[in-house]
């Protein structure tokens, strides 16, 4: 079983969910915890450079939670966003920056 670690952004979003949206997000995160890097489409997608996205519907939209894997069977969530064609490239770039910040911080310890 993989341990899911929430970034502040993802934790803030996740704790705001209720009802069916909370259930949908929890199901996908539980699946990620069980499958780890073996989780594939349509549930997860590899974006390159050790960056992945978890894919599901919540809040009546397609949601994405970006994440990476770390030592000790950890899944580190980075960002979350509403999937829209016009903002997808920008959001993936933002997730890559969050991943770089995480890796830099981890390297300092």
Explain the meaning of each model-derived region.
Residues 1-62, 71-75, 81-109:
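Basic, Lys/Arg-enriched alpha-helical interface segments
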Residues 64-66:
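Short acidic loop-to-beta-strand element that houses the catalytic metal-binding Asp/Glu
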């Amino acid at each position: 079983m993989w341990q899911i670690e929430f970034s502040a952004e993802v934790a803030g979003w996740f704790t705001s969910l209720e009802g069916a949206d909370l259930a949908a997000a929890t199901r996908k995160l539980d699946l990620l915890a069980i499958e780890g890097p073996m989780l594939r489409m349509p549930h997860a997608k590899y974006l390159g450079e050790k960056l992945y996205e978890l894919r599901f519907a919540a809040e009546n939209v397609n949601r994405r939670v970006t994440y990476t894997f770390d030592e000790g069977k950890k899944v580190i969530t980075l960002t979350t966003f509403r999937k829209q064609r016009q903002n997808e490239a920008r959001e993936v770039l933002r997730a890559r920056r969050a991943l770089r910040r995480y890796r830099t911080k981890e390297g300092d310890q």
